[in-house]
Regions:
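Transmembrane alpha-helices and adjacent helix-loop boundaries
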Residues: 1-293
C-alpha cells in the first residue's frame, strides 16, 4: 500500500524537493534585504548550461552540474554589482529585465539551447535520492548560515541599512555574498532538474516559475529556514489537493495567497513561531502571578 502510494506521488515529491532548493535560493537573497527576482534566470542558466555541456560536448553529468553551478554563481555576482546602487522596486524591475534577457537568449541561441523547441535528449541521471539528499543538505547549510555572523548581518541589513552601517556591516560585501549563495542554489538545483526531466523548454523558467519561487517564501515566511520549505510544500501540493475543482484551481491558489498575506503577513511558519512565543510568555507570566510571595 505504501509502495503504491509512493510510486503514485513520487513525481510530486520530486517536484517538491527541486522547488525547495529554488525557494531557499530566493529566501537567502530576500533575507539580505535585496528585492531580487533574478533566480528564475540564474536557474535557467544553470539548467541549460549543464544540459548543453553533456548533450553537445559529452561531458560527464557531475562535471556539467558543477560548471552550471559555478557559472550561475559568477553571473549572480556580476549582477550584484549594478544592483548595489538600486533599492526596492528598482531592484525588482532590474532583475526582472535580467530574467527576460536570459529567456530571450534561451530562444535565440538555438545552437546551444535548441531555441523555441527546447533542448531534448538529456540523460536522466538524477533520481529521487539525489534530490532528497541535495534538499536536506541545502536546508542544513541555510540553517547554519542563519545562525552565523553572516546571517545576523543579513538581518541587520534587511531591518535597517543605516543602523547596519553604523555597526560596521559592509552592506555591498554581504549583498554580494547573498547573491552568490542564491545563485549557487539556483544554478545547482536548475542543473539537477535538467538531468531529471529529460528535456528543457524556454518557458520552463518563465514568469510562472518566478512568481512561484517568490510565493513559496512569502507564504511560508521569511525568517525561519522552514518558511520556504513549508511554503513550497503547500503550493506544490495545492494543485493536487484541489484537482476536483478543475478550472478553479488557480483561483484557489490566488485566494490562499491573499488570505495569508492579509491575516499572516509574516508567513505561516513565522506566524506560528510568534504564536508559540506569545503562549509561552503568557504562561510564564501566569505562573509568576500564581507563585506564593
Amino acid at each position: 500500500m505504501m509502495v503504491d502510494f509512493f510510486i503514485a506521488y513520487r513525481p510530486l515529491f520530486d517536484l517538491f524537493l527541486l522547488h525547495t532548493g529554488y525557494a531557499l535560493g530566493q529566501y537567502v537573497v530576500l533575507r539580505s534585504g535585496t528585492f531580487s527576482i533574478a533566480n528564475a534566470g540564474l536557474t535557467a542558466i544553470g539548467a541549460y548550461l549543464a544540459a548543453s555541456l553533456t548533450v553537445k560536448l559529452g561531458l560527464p553529468v557531475p562535471v556539467s552540474i558543477l560548471l552550471g553551478t559555478l557559472v550561475s554563481i559568477l553571473v549572480s555576482m556580476l549582477l550584484a554589482w549594478p544592483l548595489a546602487r538600486l533599492r526596492g522596486v528598482y531592484q525588482a524591475i532590474a532583475t526582472l529585465a535580467f530574467v527576460q534577457v536570459v529567456l530571450s537568449l534561451n530562444i535565440y541561441a538555438e545552437r546551444l539551447t535548441g531555441g523555441a523547441m527546447g533542448l531534448s535528449g538529456i540523460p536522466k541521471a538524477v533520481g529521487t535520492w539525489t534530490l532528497l539528499i541535495s534538499a536536506v543538505v541545502a536546508i542544513y547549510l541555510v540553517a547554519c548560515l542563519n545562525r552565523s555572523r553572516i546571517g545576523r548581518a543579513f538581518d541587520a541589513i534587511r531591518q535597517d541599512e543605516a543602523v547596519a552601517v553604523s555597526l560596521g556591516v559592509a552592506i555591498s560585501r554581504y549583498q554580494l555574498l547573498a547573491f552568490a549563495l542564491s545563485g549557487a542554489l539556483a544554478g545547482f538545483f536548475g542543473s539537477l532538474e535538467a538531468f531529471h526531466v529529460y528535456s528543457l523548454e524556454p518557458n520552463q523558467f518563465g514568469f510562472p516559475f518566478l512568481v512561484a519561487a517568490l510565493s513559496y517564501v512569502v507564504l511560508g515566511g521569511r525568517h525561519s529556514v522552514w518558511g520556504p520549505v513549508v511554503g513550497t510544500a503547500v503550493l506544490v501540493a495545492l494543485p493536487e489537493v484541489s484537482r476536483p475543482l478543475a478550472d478553479y484551481r488557480m483561483l484557489v491558489y490566488g485566494l490562499l495567497l491573499i488570505l495569508v498575506i492579509n491575516y499572516m503577513p509574516r508567513g505561516i511558519v513565522d506566524t506560528w513561531i510568534d504564536y508559540r512565543k506569545n503562549r509561552r510568555r503568557v504562561r510564564s507570566s501566569e505562573q509568576q502571578e500564581k507563585a506564593p510571595l
